[in-house]
């Protein structure tokens, strides 16, 4: 490890607000005295038990508490786990965004959807350009990833230089643009780097990550071997290089290309408009035009590679897509690997497609956009940091990168595995976690942001598991005498027509309860509701071993 040049004795605070010990929701604050810059601002997708939740974004309480210090956001690339929370966060902290051209283009579309395009300042940054904000100077470095225009960041502070790789791979033969700027990593390394924050996603995988161009050869073989079939290819919408290679194959084999899926249409529109996607004249057709061409002259590029229930491919598979129906002998290609948690959904879609007679190809048509072990070692050798700080990944991924650092000669004192919320204070003299800040999940449900918490989720889980029983009764004002009811309405508990005797017995339990309350002159609504819930709940549990949500409703006349 090379000793860094002696720096100011002040300490840089590195505060991950999300993205550690998880996949997604990446966001990290860098603080020095009265300046804070934020690197990326991503979302994650809900866990299976987050019923009804659309998105999960980071809790930015710490940034709001220090809003006067926050100078800007630096974005490494345009994936949802790095930009998805921007519209929500910038409604509360409106500071400039700095990113490369394509990344800004994707962010612009998001801001436009939220009506924020005129209120948020964005600046396109070129590779090699430096941005000065407060105590910081930030340089963008060319990298490769599964989306174009990805960048690493060299963050210059009075305490030293921190290199943040963002999501990256080492690709010497990219489909578009230049290879990763390894020379610049080496030049910065010679200056003396305090810390390297390196992508850990593939830290468990040995070897080097394959070039994106290798997928092009596989795709070409598929087009060659399936000349007589319609081809449908599902991939990540953001993988513009993959889309480019599919279009290249389509042109070579004389096929028209139809794009399906909202996110796919959006990304292709942005990428082609900004010059990141080359579209031969007249190669694109609308999905409605497919019927005008023989199957062997068409290819459909679609969303749904992860088995998402509402994505285009899923709707094709289950027969609910209005414009595309799966035909026997269709060739369907999954040009992706299932992300953790989506394996079951992907397998289900593959089975449905095969049942319809389609030929499904789902192996060896994808390469990762993340660095494997040898790529990570290469970056370490070039940057030669004093401290290793693994980022981006679950705990096991962070540990895997820590082991790589150990193999390269780093002792445990110079490897910092952080958790979201940790405050790492670091300079030339040392690095230590000195405290924690508040972090957590903010759930987005439709137009509601943060108004759904664990209590609401528990209610939804209970409703999903055991259903609901509503007890309706009418009482006379003043005397509290029962005039009508109690009547029972249930949903998701039992099928009433097949459980009439159970419901009759439940009605008897309620009648007995109300008679007892009347005899005891109980007129307090709160007491009545509690007694009704307890009596009915005990009966239902005894008879069914279920605990539905019970809601008594009292009307007074």
What are these model-predicted stretches?
Residues 521-557:
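C-terminal tails and terminal domains of large nucleic-acid-associated
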Residues 15, 31, 139, 301-302, ...:
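Residues in well-ordered beta-strands of folded domains
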């Amino acid at each position: 490890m090379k000793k860094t040049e002696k720096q100011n004795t002040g300490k840089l605070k590195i505060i991950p607000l999300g993205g550690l010990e998880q996949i997604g929701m990446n966001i990290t604050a860098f603080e020095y005295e009265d300046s804070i810059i934020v690197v990326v601002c991503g979302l994650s997708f809900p866990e299976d038990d987050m019923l009804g939740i659309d998105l999960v974004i980071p809790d930015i309480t710490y940034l709001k508490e220090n809003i006067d210090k926050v100078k800007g956001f630096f974005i490494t690339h345009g994936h949802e786990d790095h930009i998805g929370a921007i519209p929500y966060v910038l409604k509360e902290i409106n500071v400039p965004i700095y990113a490369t051209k394509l990344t800004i283009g994707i962010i612009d579309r998001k801001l436009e959807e939220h009506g924020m395009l005129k209120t948020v300042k964005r600046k396109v940054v070129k590779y090699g350009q430096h941005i000065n904000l407060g105590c910081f100077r930030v340089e963008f470095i060319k990298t490769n990833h599964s989306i174009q225009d990805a960048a690493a960041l060299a963050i210059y502070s009075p305490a030293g230089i921190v290199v943040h790789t963002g999501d990256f791979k080492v690709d010497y033969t990219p489909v578009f643009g230049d290879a990763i700027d390894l020379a610049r990593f080496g030049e910065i390394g010679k200056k003396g780097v305090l810390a390297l924050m390196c992508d850990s996603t593939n830290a468990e995988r040995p070897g080097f990550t394959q070039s994106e161009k290798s997928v092009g050869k596989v795709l070409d073989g598929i087009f060659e071997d399936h000349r007589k079939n319609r081809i449908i290819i599902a991939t990540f919408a953001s993988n513009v290089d993959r889309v480019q290679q599919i279009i290249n194959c389509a042109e070579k084999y004389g096929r028209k290309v139809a794009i399906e899926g909202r996110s796919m249409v959006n990304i292709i529109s942005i990428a082609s408009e900004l010059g990141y996607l080359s579209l031969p004249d007249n190669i694109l057709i609308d999905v409605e035009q497919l019927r005008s061409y023989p199957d062997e002259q068409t290819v459909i590029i679609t969303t749904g590679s992860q088995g998402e229930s509402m994505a285009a491919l899923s709707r094709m598979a289950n027969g609910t897509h209005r414009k595309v129906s799966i035909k026997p002998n269709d060739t369907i290609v999954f040009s992706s690997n299932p992300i953790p948690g989506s394996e079951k959904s992907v397998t289900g879609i593959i089975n449905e497609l095969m049942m319809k007679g389609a030929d499904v190809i789902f192996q060896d048509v994808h390469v990762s956009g993340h660095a494997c072990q040898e790529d990570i070692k290469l970056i370490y050798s070039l940057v030669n940091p004093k401290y290793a700080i693994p980022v981006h990944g679950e705990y096991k991924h962070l540990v895997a990168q820590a082991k790589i650092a150990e193999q390269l000669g780093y002792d445990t004192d110079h490897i910092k595995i952080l958790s979201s919320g940790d405050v790492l204070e670091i300079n030339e003299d040392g690095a230590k976690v000195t405290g924690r800040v508040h972090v957590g999940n903010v759930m987005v449900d439709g137009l509601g942001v943060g108004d759904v918490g664990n209590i609401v989720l528990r209610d939804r889980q209970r409703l999903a598991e055991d259903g609901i029983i509503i007890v309706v009764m009418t009482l006379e004002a003043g005397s509290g005498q029962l005039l009508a009811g109690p009547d029972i309405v249930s949903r998701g508990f039992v099928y009433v027509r097949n459980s009439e005797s159970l419901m009759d017995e439940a009605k008897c339990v309620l009648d007995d309860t109300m008679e007892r309350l009347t005899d005891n002159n109980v007129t307090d609504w709160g007491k009545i509701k509690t007694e009704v819930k307890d009596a009915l709940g005990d009966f239902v549990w005894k008879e069914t071993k279920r605990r539905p949500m019970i809601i008594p409703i009292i009307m007074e006349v």
